[in-house]
Amino acid sequence: MVIGTMTNLENQLHAQMVRAIEDVKDSKKIGISFSGGVDSCLLAKICQDLGYDVLLLTMGFEDSHDVEFSKKMAKMLGMDHDVEIISENTFSDVAKKIWDEINVDNLSWNENCIAFYYVAKLAKKHKISKVITANGIDELFCGYNAYRDSVSDGEDAVLDMIKDKLDNELRMMKAVNKIASEFDVTIAQPFLSEQFIEFGKTIPLEHKINGKDDLVRKHIVRKLAMSIGVPEESALKLKKAMQYGSLIHKNLLKVKKTWNMNF
């Protein structure tokens, strides 16, 4: 771990991430929800450096971006990895089942619950009862493209958006865990802990986003990732949300009319 190359703020962020992960890690073997993007690679690398017994878990339709990219990044990290390929034959029924269970007319919530259904299913196959995710990083560090619009309205507008997105994410992850419980799996989010959120809010905005034309964002997260050995290809990769990278979004829009889904 090349801690010496970090700035003081990056060191603080790293220490807070380690602490947050240690607070949720209570089983011998853990799964990590893994797309190969900077957030999940950073989470995986920290767990690897801590000496944890880890399996990287990816889901997606065959030949989807996340399936292919995650394989490449897992190999570069030298970590164990497995992939759950979503069956086109059963996807519609799974989507309907989750729609009924969470009873929320929100496209993103349904997409995420479907994604974690397959992650939890894969974890169960490996007798893993806890899966750790990097949810919270995009919310706290301006990962979403929408932050480019709010930054033009000033810092207060960005801070309001951070709060709103965190509130939504915390509520959504309760629905995710409801779905994952079918497989006796808990989905843990260390970067949505109260302590980590409070720390994340103290990091100056210029370390997160540099104006309305900033296509990269999450700058301190990306720098930290490269400092501890995350492949540059992942660390500098632009955001592609789980539901798009896995092709869940595309396929859910295809089946929603079948079930009269209102989103």
Spans of model-derived segments:
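Long, continuous compositionally biased terminal/linker segments
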Residues: 251-263
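Acidic/polar loop patches that form or flank catalytic/metal-binding clefts of enzymes
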Residues: 209, 230-237
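Generic cytosolic/nucleocytoplasmic N-terminal low-complexity/intrinsically disordered segments
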Residues: 236-239, 255
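ATP-dependent adenylate-handling active sites, centered on carboxylate activation for C-N bond formation
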Residues: 3-228, 242-254
